[in-house]
């Protein structure tokens, strides 16, 4: 096994003494930094490389902090209107995962860069910390690379907003087969719509 494989195995054993100490120190360090800040290099190089990161010009790593927990519905004084079924305010769970939310917030703040992917680095009782891999599409190294210039296309603008990253595809239910997550037809919505639309075909 190469060095990256050993690093991957170390990260899988998060309850070991080494990892517990390391993650605790990192969470303490990140807690004292800004909510969104640039990291000089990937904290987990083996994970970053598996997600497409290259140690070359045009690649940037940003670290972001996301508050853990459920999502409170943003309604004034709890006035939701409608039926009692939709009166919930406090104990709602977001449809999207926190990693996807981290990518979106990073993409909003850094609109000139493209979000490639992201990964978990640490967490404590209040926050989760993610590192987001971003690409500068105006850099000649990226534009001239045959394996990387696909992200320069205009169809890849704000891909994190449209569920195109790994975290986004996960919360959309893609990647595990349509039998698992009812996504036959491309998405959960299209599958639900087809099953709930009455189609009376005219006999000719």
Swiss-Prot record:
The keyword Transmembrane helix does not apply. One of its GO terms (cellular component) is cytosolic large ribosomal subunit. Residues 159-174 have a biased composition (Basic residues). InterPro entries: Rbsml_eL15_core_dom_sf, Ribosomal_eL15, Ribosomal_eL15_CS, Ribosomal_uL23/eL15/eS24_sf. Residues 71-91, 159-182 are annotated as: Disordered. One of its GO terms (molecular function) is RNA binding. Keywords: Ribonucleoprotein, Ribosomal protein. GO terms for biological process: cytoplasmic translation. Gene3D superfamilies: Ribosomal protein l15e. Pfam families: Ribosomal_L15e. Belongs to the eukaryotic ribosomal protein eL15 family. NCBIfam families: PRK04243.1 (NF003269). This is Large ribosomal subunit protein eL15. It comes from Faxonius limosus (Spinycheek crayfish). The gene is RPL15.
């Amino acid at each position: 096994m190469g060095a990256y494989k050993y690093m991957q195995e170390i990260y899988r054993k998060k309850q070991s003494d080494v990892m517990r100490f390391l993650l605790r120190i990192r969470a303490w360090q990140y807690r004292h930094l800004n909510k969104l800040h640039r990291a000089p290099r990937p904290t987990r190089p083996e994970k970053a490389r598996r997600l497409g990161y290259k140690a070359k010009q045009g690649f940037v790593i940003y670290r972001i902090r996301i508050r853990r927990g459920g999502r409170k519905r943003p309604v004034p004084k709890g006035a939701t209107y409608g039926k009692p079924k939709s009166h919930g305010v406090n104990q709602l769970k977001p449809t999207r995962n926190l990693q996807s939310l981290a990518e979106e917030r990073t993409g909003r703040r850094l609109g000139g860069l493209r979000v490639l992917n992201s990964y978990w680095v640490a967490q404590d009782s209040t926050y989760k910390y993610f590192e987001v891999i971003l690409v500068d599409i105006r850099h000649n190294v990226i534009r001239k690379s045959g394996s990387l210039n696909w992200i320069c296309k205009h169809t890849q603008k704000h891909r994190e907003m449209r569920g195109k990253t790994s975290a986004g595809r996960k919360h959309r239910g893609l990647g595990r087969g349509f039998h698992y997550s009812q996504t036959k037809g491309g998405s959960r919505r299209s599958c639900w719509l087809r099953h709930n639309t009455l189609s009376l075909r005219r006999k000719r």
